[in-house]
Structures are given as structure tokens and as C-alpha cells.
Curated annotation (Swiss-Prot):
Biological source species: Rickettsia typhi (strain ATCC VR-144 / Wilmington)
Modification N6-(pyridoxal phosphate)lysine occurs at: K230
Main location, first listed in the record: cytoplasm
BP-aspect Gene Ontology terms: glycine biosynthetic process from serine; tetrahydrofolate interconversion
UniProt gene name: glyA
GO molecular function: glycine hydroxymethyltransferase activity; pyridoxal phosphate binding
Protein name (database record): Serine hydroxymethyltransferase
Catalytic activity: (6R)-5,10-methylene-5,6,7,8-tetrahydrofolate + glycine + H2O = (6S)-5,6,7,8-tetrahydrofolate + L-serine
Amino acid sequence: MNILNNNLYGMDKEIYEIIKNEKLRQNNVIELIASENFVSSAVLEAQGSILTNKYAEGYPSKRFYNGCDEVDKAEVLAIERAKKLFNCKYANVQPHSGSQANQAVYLALLQPCDTILGMSLDSGGHLTHGAAPNISGKWFNTVAYNVDKETYLIDYDEIKRLAVLHNPKLLIAGFSAYPRKIDFARFREIADKVGAYLMADIAHIAGLVATGEHQSPIPYAHVVTSTTHKTLRGPRGGLILSDYEEIGKKINSALFPGLQGGPLMHVIAAKAVAFLENLQPEYKCYIKQVISNAKALAISLQERGYDILTGGTDNHIVLVDLRKDGITGKCAANSLDRAGITCNKNAIPFDTTSPFVTSGIRFGTSACTTKGFKEKDFVLIGHMVAEILDGLKNNEDNSKTEQKVLSEVKKLIKLFPFYD
């Protein structure tokens, strides 16, 4: 038997069944996890291609292995398309993830024990922005800024005060759970005042930046990092951008050989495909719809009496503060999951509960918008979510409400076919 001709079902029925069941799950739930999306069949085809066989340490035309002519072409396409999409001079498409993109920047620009200033976790920051359990919190002196205690908006005056007080080497503008726009120009002013590098982490809003629905950090940040999934709707991976070519050279060396070995050429090819899709006019319409859907969801939940953090949203993220309702984020997310609505528990600013419990939940509209959902559908989803949350108030057993909402979810999801 030639192993090269083995198909998955014949070789490994267990994994085959897992993939089949996961496809069924994705096809039968309302997916509201803000960091997830559905890629095109073209992206899947590229990522599942024979490019996975090719080892290609180094960069195009500067590899440590022979036989890289075709994968060089794929990586150059990905680089050039990324530069065009974000209107910048430098792009590195090799990071395996957004976390490793951030690590590459730290390795390129910082020394151990340098000070970094980033958003705190409960205010919406990411683990890699200096959180204690993360490598960024172990290798560097980290200082966290919070949002305003009344408005929950970024407090630029407080960031400036902390920057002057602590003199960071790197200032980070970015988030994983913040529903409003970021003023990158203000961040650059603060960075310049203390002589810091400015890194913008746009993992969540990259699609909005690429389409002009959010201010681009490229003219302001020394370096920009992102994931390539989420609103970019590509394969899971990382991306680094800059208009500073000298910084780009440092990052290239930091990523390889400093942090990674061989790049994942099948994933890079899939990134190239996604970037090409994102350069089409239809993608701008998609991002506009993502934002409109998020606003519709937020308003729907507000009308049912639920507190939306900051009073609304400017992007794909909707954060619900459940403190006054006496419901934990963990309990809400689990009950919604049983009703066919997938989201995640999420800390809210100044949250006093455990990060494994939390006082809030986070929704995102990117994935369902890819399936074709419009504002009216998200209004309906908002009412479904509210039904579940209403049922949880002073009630340990929410099973009847979960079954009722699950039947409504099934009716709605049938209107939006999945992969053929």
C-alpha cells in the first residue's frame, strides 16, 4: 500500500469523524465568538495543499533549502498583497500566530527588563501585551493602563501620565475586547513624548483598517501586528506591517532565525488567497455589514434591558456587562452554548471575579456576517440571547428556555447554507 494515496477516512476514521462532527457543529450554531470567522473554500484548498510538504527556512530568494522556487512565488504574492491591502512599505507574513508576531517585535526592538506599557487584561488588552502569566510579563517590566472608570473608554491622559512616569521603551495600542475606535495619532504623540516605540496590535480590527472603516495605524505606529483570521477572514496566522524598512529588517532577523524556524508555506499561500479576496470590492461591503450587524445586536440587547459596555460599538465586538443581572459570564456562555449560540465569557473593566468566571460576555459578528446574516437577523439573535439571560436570573435550571431558543436557532440557521 502506498501511503501517499491514503485518504483520511481509510487511514484514520476517528479524526475523520471529529472533522465531520465539527463541520456539523459549525453548520448548526450561531457563531458569535469575536475572534472566529469562516474562511472561503479557496483558502481551505490552499491551506490543505501539498505546499505543506515544503521546508523553506529563510526568506524568498534567501532560503537555506533548495527547491523553493514555487513557494518563493507564493510568499512574495502574500507580501505584496498585504502591502497593497494596508498601504505600507513592509510586510512579514511568516508569523505562525498573532502572539508570535508580537514576540518578534519584542525580540527586535527590546531588551529583557525593558518597560512596556499596554492595556490591562480586564480593560480589554491581550495576554501578550504584558500580562503576568505571559512571556511578555515575565521578560519585561510591564505597566498596564486602564480605561476610564465611568465611560470605559480609553483614557489618553492617563496613558500619557503613566508614560511620563514609567518611561516605557514600547507603547502598545491594541486590544482583544474593546468595542470603540482607537486614536492612533494620540498614541503616537504620547510615544514621541517619552521616546518610545509605538506598536499597534490590530488583530481584531485589521479588516476595518484595510477597508477604511477604522483609522489606519500605519502612518503613526513604528510597527503593526495582526492575526490573519478574525475580520481578515483568512487562515489562522500572524502578520507584521510597517512603513519603517529599517525596523522591518530587524523584525525579519528576529522572526527568523530568532524566534521561528521554517515557515508554514501552505498557510502563507492561504494568507495570499485571503488577501486577494480582501482586495475585492465585495470585502468593503462585508466589513460595513459586520459593523452594522454589531450595532443592531447591541441595540437589540439594550432594548431588552442589558448593559452594553460603552453604550454601543464601532466595530464587530459587543460586550455585555452582567453585574447588575446577577449572572456570571461563565454561566451565561454555557447556557447560550446549550441553546446553539456560541460566544465567550469575558472580563469587564475592573472586574473582581476570576478570569475563569468573569462578569461579562463577548459577542462578535464577523462569522455570521460571512454566512449572510443581516441586521434583522441580529435583532432576532439579540432577542434569543436576552431570552437565555432572562431565564438565568434567579434560576439554576434554564433547560426549558435553552430548548426553546435552540429550536429558534435551528430555524434561523437553515436559511444560511454552509460549505457545499
